Amino acid sequence: MELHGALVASPGMGHAVPILELGKHLLNHHGFDRVTVFLVTDDVSRSKSLIGKTLMEEDPKFVIRFIPLDVSGQDLSGSLLTKLAEMMRKALPEIKSSVMELEPRPRVFVVDLLGTEALEVAKELGIMRKHVLVTTSAWFLAFTVYMASLDKQELYKQLSSIGALLIPGCSPVKFERAQDPRKYIRELAESQRIGDEVITADGVFVNTWHSLEQVTIGSFLDPENLGRVMRGVPVYPVGPLVRPAEPGLKHGVLDWLDLQPKESVVYVSFGSGGALTFEQTNELAYGLELTGHRFVWVVRPPAEDDPSASMFDKTKNETEPLDFLPNGFLDRTKDIGLVVRTWAPQEEILAHKSTGGFVTHCGWNSVLESIVNGVPMVAWPLYSEQKMNARMVSGELKIALQINVADGIVKKEVIAEMVKRVMDEEEGKEMRKNVKELKKTAEEALNMTHIPSAYFT
């Protein structure tokens, strides 16, 4: 019988890329005859352009379909988790009908962490194996399922505690260093639901690898620690699921990088969804200018109230005037800097020999792409689990410096200092050494199969 897998990704490149890469992995290493990937999106044309290099249109074994959503009547003012969960809920009927139409009927179903309600669809359709792909860290999975396992009294004790958050088998950390307590409380219902639904799956795949999160993964394997919280549901590290750089890609940014010295350029990007306020955008511009370092900055129009505003911005912005930047900034930095509107080929930039540092929002895709290319980071978290990611890369892995965003606007002097410390100082050299060692473990993980060979048969 033909082994067919159906994979579903919630909106956003941070979910689409790992799902697509997992699909390729299942075809290449696990004996799948066919994989169909469904991408839920509120903007099909934008999604197609962003994942263009990943599309395998000539391969009938790997099919990508889009599930379009009309969000014109949806309230997009809430937290990102709430917005995305509601979008996935709205897409459930279309997901069900689309999977029902597949021939042959899929025997394996995978959905990312924000689409766990679709596990019930797989159950209704009689699909043999249903799974969740966690597109972020094992630590975030641990946090999600552990918090969902607590009774109400213990949960609020954790939220109000001035002590450490004690997740079994994980390093203790103060709650506010991992999550914004006020935002988490607003997302509590959705987060608890997701944590409860994860353990109804037959297995959980995580976009990480043993050497990156050895202690946390070990705890999931221990029936006395996180294994108990998972109630026997197996957890498999399958990362790094990142899109490889495209050899020979032609782009103006890459041509510019070709002219720069080795590891001399700071790359600045806040992902496909990140946005800064007008004031913060200006401070960042002045900060980059103060460093005197070469830079590539992917810039988007400011957003005053929502740091994830760019995720739902359907305007192209490629030709929009950059009049929100400080007066004269582009002229003063034209010999050392390159400002790019909206989008740049991130994988290729991070893989380029001239790139020496990365100012990032710490979306998990960006973190992994930085690691697999051996680039140290300035961690500047904006939303979702990015605070946890920033804490991990700066505190545990020591491959980044974390900017403190709790005080509001990050001033230009702080930005300049952070960049110089990563690019010029001894601690930056140590971070570069650490991340290049992690890069080797990522390469080893890519050549390994972490799911048992007979698991899907």
From Swiss-Prot:
Classification via Pfam families: UDPGT (PF00201)
MF (Gene Ontology): UDP-glycosyltransferase activity
Keyword Cytoplasm in record: no
Enzyme type, top EC level: transferase
InterPro entries from the UniProt entry: UDP_glucos_trans, UDP_glycos_trans_CS
Its EC number(s): 2.4.1.-
Record flagged with keyword Cytoplasm: no
Record PROSITE patterns: UDPGT (PS00375)
Source taxon at top rank: Eukaryota
Binding site for UDP-alpha-D-glucose: 272, 343-344, 361-369, 383-386
Keywords associated with the record: Glycosyltransferase, Transferase
PANTHER family on file: UDP-GLYCOSYLTRANSFERASE 72E1
Family: Belongs to the UDP-glycosyltransferase family.
Name of this chain's protein: UDP-glycosyltransferase 72C1
Lineage, uppermost ranks: Eukaryota, Viridiplantae, Streptophyta, Embryophyta, Tracheophyta
Gene behind the chain: UGT72C1
